Regions:
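Membrane-proximal intracellular helices of multi-pass ion channels
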Residues: 1-461
Length: 461
């Protein structure tokens, strides 16, 4: 009598090139790897004009560049050599588009096979709705980024080449990529350390080009994909509509409030013409959402203006964009959930769509954790700098770090080693934390009763 033999099933290993770790771990470790390499390169004597840069300052700069923040402890133009500036720009580009996005693109270009885990990770990194669409979206993302940056470079050449000569080409390249990636780094320290775009407060052309680049990078690649396909499909997803509507609300609303608050302030907008005041208010509103460039002296702004900008920095840009923060859709879900509750509903409704409860819970969790991180770090920094810095300035700077914005009122330059490490953690969490949190909170769909309204899907965080 023969014995029944059963073959033991063995799980086939995932042969994808990103196999071996979860999506959250891969995203976090990839950013940490880039930061580590960037730190090593920036500590080389060839990277700085003086030939010496401390490890902590190099790590802070690498973290700020990779997390596309823009907070600096050493002025980019006056302290770093051309080699160092190139390293910083490379970190910005990798951090803005994402290491996962770039490596996925090169893997596809080399015709390498991507496993299921790889596709899922790629889909999360570009906020693609569905694995089958991930590779298609990836190609569009790279093309869009290259196109926007090329256009920005060409437009800025007309302003910077006449001003700086041949060096204007490099200034144009650096500024365009930094603006599109919402990084906030600049090469205008030649006009004074940490001057940012203050020397261009009356140059409407430069401001307009940079605003365009900031908006392009901050809307999110999936929104641009839908806008590119709008002529064929004649419709936008709920996600794209929410991103566009609330982005405009925050851009315009922020500009109006800043103009009202700073209109007569002689140290900020008071000395500008009426068109100059309007332009400065609009530029600062757009930049505050995660770009980190300024045309007015932020330290001279009123406390209420700083508080307003802190909120805008905390909100940030759109999911799948080059910007940070808790994301505009996350904040939109919170606001519209509050509205729904005020109307007596027990669910969140946006544009005639019922938003799944797990999306609402995810948004609330991201905002609460983000608030704890931002304001918790503000308390710690204030405790260490209370003699020279106000509490409002600490809140402003901490929201800038968490929102990966890069705007500064002078606090960062006064940080001790411990506070620098805290802000590095804040920048890292602001860049990869919300994304990682959204992934880790993703649950399997349950068997809830069908609602009367159609279900809407929005990427948050």
């Amino acid at each position: 009598m023969g014995k029944n033999k059963t073959k033991k099933r063995t799980r086939r290993p995932n042969k994808g090139w990103l196999a071996g770790s979860s999506a959250t771990q891969t995203i976090c470790s990839s950013f940490l790897l880039v930061i580590a390499v960037g730190t090593l390169l920036l500590t080389l004597p060839i990277s700085s004009r003086t030939g010496r840069l401390g490890v902590i300052d190099a790590m802070f700069t690498a973290t700020s560049a990779t997390c596309v923040t823009g907070l600096i402890v050493r002025d980019t133009w006056s302290q770093f050599s051309l080699f160092g500036q190139i390293i910083i720009l490379m970190l910005i580009q990798v951090g803005g588009l994402g290491l996962v996005t770039l490596t996925s693109f090169f893997a596809l270009a080399a015709r390498r096979r991507m496993g299921f885990r790889d596709l899922r990770l790629l889909g999360e990194s570009v906020s693609a709705d569905g694995l089958s669409k991930a590779t298609e979206v990836l190609k569009i993302v790279i093309k869009l980024a290259a196109a926007f940056e090329a256009v920005g470079i060409v437009l800025l050449l007309f302003a910077f080449v006449p001003q700086f000569g041949a060096e204007g080409v490099w200034v144009s390249v650096f500024t365009a990529i930094s603006a599109f990636c919402n990084a906030g780094f600049d090469l205008f320290g030649r006009f004074g350390d940490y001057s940012s775009l203050v020397p261009y407060v009356n140059n409407y052309y430069v401001q307009a080009v940079i605003m365009f680049m900031i908006m392009a990078g901050g809307l999110g690649f999936m929104v641009w994909v839908e806008l590119a396909e709008y002529r064929k499909k004649r419709r936008l997803s709920l996600h794209a509509k929410v991103v566009l509507q609330f982005s405009v609300i925050f851009w315009v609303g922020g500009a109006v409030l800043l103009a009202l608050l700073e209109w007569s302030n002689p140290r900020t907008m008071g000395g500008l013409s009426v068109p100059g005041k309007i332009m400065a208010a609009l530029f600062q509103s757009v930049s505050t959402r995660t770009a980190g460039m300024n045309t007015i002296d932020l330290a001279a702004c009123s406390p209420i203006s700083k508080l307003l900008m802190s909120v805008l920095q905390f909100i940030g840009a759109a999911p799948g964009s080059t910007g940070g923060g808790v994301k505009v859709t996350t904040f939109a879900v919170l606001i519209l959930t509050i509205r729904s509750v005020a109307q007596g509903r027990d669910d969140c409704v946006i544009g005639g769509h019922h938003i799944e409860s797990k999306t609402v819970y995810r948004a609330l969790t991201i905002i609460v954790i983000g608030a704890v991180a931002a304001f918790g770090s503000a308390v710690v920094v204030y405790y260490n700098t209370a003699e020279t810095v106000s509490v409002i300035d600490c809140i402003f700077e901490s929201c800038s770090a968490f929102g990966t914005v890069g705007l500064s009122v002078g606090v960062t330059g006064q940080l001790n080693t411990g506070a620098k490490l805290l802000y590095m953690a804040c920048m890292f969490m602001g860049r990869v934390g919300p994304v990682s949190l959204a992934i880790s909170l993703t649950a399997k769909p349950d068997d809830n009763k069908r609602k009367v309204l159609p279900v809407g899907h929005i990427n948050v965080g």
